[in-house]
UniProtKB/Swiss-Prot annotation:
Quaternary structure and interacting proteins, as annotated: Part of the ribosomal stalk of the 50S ribosomal subunit. The N-terminus interacts with L11 and the large rRNA to form the base of the stalk. The C-terminus forms an elongated spine to which L12 dimers bind in a sequential fashion forming a multimeric L10(L12)X complex.
Source taxonomy: Bacteria, Pseudomonadati, Pseudomonadota, Betaproteobacteria, Burkholderiales
Gene name in the database record: rplJ
GO BP terms in the entry: translation
One Pfam family linked to the record: Ribosomal_L10
GO molecular function: large ribosomal subunit rRNA binding; structural constituent of ribosome
Keyword Ribonucleoprotein on entry: yes
Keywords attached to this entry: Ribonucleoprotein, Ribosomal protein, RNA-binding, rRNA-binding
Gene3D superfamilies assigned to the protein according to its UniProt record, in alphabetical order: 3.30.70.1730, 6.10.250.290
GO cellular component: large ribosomal subunit
The protein's name in its UniProt record: Large ribosomal subunit protein uL10
């Protein structure tokens, strides 16, 4: 069943809107995957802010034309699922994690910052911690010297407080 021209234009418009917001696009072949597994993948993706779509490749190529993801146009062949995410690593992370447990989902390619990524590039991108984790690690690094200084000063104050009480005479209750 083919789509009417107006339906095709609506799909291209919707995908173009996703492409405009996305930082990352991941392509994965889903040949032979069960509906139950695909549903699990979609739920996992949705909870991580990733939009998964099964699209006609010609419509997808038209939607990415002139965008940073145009570098993937030549690889848009066969049964593909397209993962779009506004977070730089979310799409790669969701697809790569799911592909580890389900061999029917095969990562084909990806794009980030206008550069095409091969399978290994997508896996490397997936191994990078999320923005929130990186910010937490940075805060921990920035707070570490301050906390160490506070601990040292506290220990010095405690030691000095103990030293003051040694030479003083204590009053004996009558």
């Amino acid at each position: 069943m083919s789509l009417q021209r107006s339906e095709k234009e609506a799909v291209i418009s919707e995908v173009s809107r996703l492409v405009a917001k996305a930082q990352t696009l991941v392509l994965a072949e889903y040949r032979g995957i069960t509906v139950a597994d695909m549903t699990k993948l979609r739920v996992q993706a949705r909870s991580n802010g990733v939009r998964l779509s099964v699209l006609k490749n010609t419509l997808a190529r038209r939607a990415v034309a002139g965008s940073a993801f145009d570098v993937l146009a030549g690889q848009m062949t066969g049964p593909l699922i397209y993962g779009f995410s506004e977070d730089a690593v979310a799409a790669a992370k969701v697809v790569a994690e799911f592909a580890k447990t389900n061999d029917k989902l095969v990562i084909r390619a990806g794009a980030f910052a206008g550069k095409a990524l091969d399978v290994n590039g997508v896996k490397q991108l997936a191994s990078i911690p999320s923005k929130e984790v990186l910010l937490a690690q940075l805060c921990g690094l920035l707070m570490s010297p301050i906390s160490r200084t506070a601990v040292v000063l506290s220990a010095l104050a405690a030691k000095k407080g103990e030293g003051e009480g040694v030479g003083q005479a204590q009053a004996v209750p009558a």
